[in-house]
């Protein structure tokens, strides 16, 4: 019998990838295309959904061709995606009525304020686990309905569909206007502000408060079941699509953090630390989000606490693209290594406000502690250290909420190739940092969810055996120095507050 594979589609913030995995969870081939980041105004971030769909089809072809396989060798397709990013499209034409509004976008602050006027930002938190914030999909849908000509009328008439990018890709992959499946999974639904964490269904009272017609919304399903088959014009025609997980939940799943008390931290455009709370819903007292971890078929859902950090890897991109301090993201480590320390400089990248644990939409970025002594090496180092400091603050919140101190941190994502950052991360946390052999845990998690649904993998134990340690960094900083640096970081964070006014965005 010839070997069989799983294809994972990873629709991310900066690119779309298709990755072919074998039974051991190893990567066989990858196809990848970046898409345009559209910034129409300060604080606005958009993607073109049609470009994302074109890229999805193309990267599938790239991956199959590189692996020298056809659809007959593929058992199932899994999808993982940038969460919260909202697409609204016409049910009849299949065309978006507006660009996708990206999770980092802050244009909906006035909508947040309006909804929070009655009950504060935690108005819906007991039901959905999330504060009112520009980050989540719900307010983005409202913005489109209120600002795109004819959108409200079409939505009321049942002519518009909403989805995060998993739903957009799934709908198109399964036929689009010709029988496309309009579904999302529990993890993505838990990021809209609309899903009841206990019933795992859309909450009609909340939809009424937002004035969003229920007819726009996809059906909520588990993270691991057959949703439909790929349509007939695709290179993957008739292959079942059998797994969907939001990117951070997918990375947790790919790290085999299946049990209560296990966690991972992903270093990507932003950083996302997820702590598995098992079948318990824990409402954070420390600025974390309560979210879905995963749900396999008809089994009980697993929940999680999440610390979301808006800007980490994208700070390095900004230094490359906007300042020209480095010509590639990888160069940041070399530049940072030209100095012994940060020279007293702290960089708080509150470009989209601050997410966990502060949730300050009025914050903006600040570079503090500058003197004539400081050079670009210090600034590069401060930019890397910002990622580690923000992670430490989120980990402190997780420890406080869970009552369990984490003993080591599993890491994944693009920035974990940066050894200087990983060592500083271990130093500032005071616990070891562990990198797995397969760093593409996001795509792997989606592959696992799909493979479980079709019997490609038997059970979670089967998946646990695939996880292997690649590298480990142990702390090498004394307690006094760690406390000094944390004190200065927290002082720097306070300097970013209260910047946004009516005439300052």
UniProtKB/Swiss-Prot annotation:
It is an enzyme of class 2 (transferase). Sn-glycerol 3-phosphate binds at residues 13, 83-84, 135, 247. Inhibited by fructose 1,6-bisphosphate (FBP). ADP binds at residues 13, 17, 269, 313, 414, 418. CDD domains: ASKHA_NBD_FGGY_GK. InterPro entries: ATPase_NBD (IPR043129), Carb_kinase_FGGY (IPR000577), Carb_kinase_FGGY_CS (IPR018483), FGGY_C (IPR018485), FGGY_N (IPR018484), Glycerol_kin (IPR005999). GO terms for molecular function: ATP binding; glycerol kinase activity. It catalyses: glycerol + ATP = sn-glycerol 3-phosphate + ADP + H(+). GO terms for biological process: glycerol catabolic process; glycerol metabolic process; glycerol-3-phosphate metabolic process. Its EC number is 2.7.1.30. Pathway: Polyol metabolism; glycerol degradation via glycerol kinase pathway; sn-glycerol 3-phosphate from glycerol: step 1/1. One of its GO terms (cellular component) is cytosol. Belongs to the FGGY kinase family. This is Glycerol kinase. It comes from Clavibacter michiganensis subsp. michiganensis (strain NCPPB 382). The lineage of its organism: Bacteria, Bacillati, Actinomycetota, Actinomycetes, Micrococcales.
